[in-house]
Amino acid sequence: MKHQLELVKVSRETLEGTREIYQKNEKDIERYLDLLLEWNEKINLVSRSVSRETLREHVVHSLIPMQLGLLEAFNSWIDSGSGGGLPGAPLAIANPAKRFFLNDNVKKKMRAVDDIIQQAGIENSETVAKSISLVDLQKGTGIVTKHAFKIDDLLRLLGSKPWKTIIMWKGVEGAAEEIRTFNKKLNTTLYEFHFGDDEPFYEGKGLLVIQR
């Protein structure tokens, strides 16, 4: 199956711009991280071995689509497989005029995240504790998901839902292989990070945008 795949190299300037977004929202993001780490001692929302510094990098990673202008098409987004609220919570903090639904089928995680977003005052977000296959996805809602699904699994769960854009945080090689072996034609753009040798966190990573 031949797929329409556009490759886009993302330069270091994009990372620098994303870090500026982080800095503008640092107070609220740090409050979110405080609560995430507090809850993580009770429920495994993120790896217990992860440092706060690495979590901050995960937040920056979550904000990259904003710097690339990929969120502008929709005012409503659902973060599926959200876990502890990544990428949805940071995106909600940095985009107060947009609505974010944090979705995961693990109910105890969503109870924790619901408490986090309430205590953090992230008023433009809410949790949805069910499989994405059971969500009543409204037209005009984009989908984001960070290292939670393979392409075929997510599209199978979405079924006939009226999605238009999906943004997936993926390893570049893995994403290209998933696209190559998928048995239906996809319109995809793969954003490959080229941030330099001194940014090892981002090595081999990228964003896959699927549109229809």
Task: Show the residue positions of the predicted features.
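Short beta->alpha connector loops
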Residues: 147-151, 172-174
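Class I SAM-dependent transferase core
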Residues: 2-72, 108-123
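Active-site capping/gating segments
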Residues: 173-212
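A short, conserved alpha-helix within the catalytic core of class I
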Residues: 150-160
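Short SAM/SAH-binding signature in class I
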Residues: 140-147
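Residue-level signal for inorganic ion chemistry
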Residues: 36, 170, 210
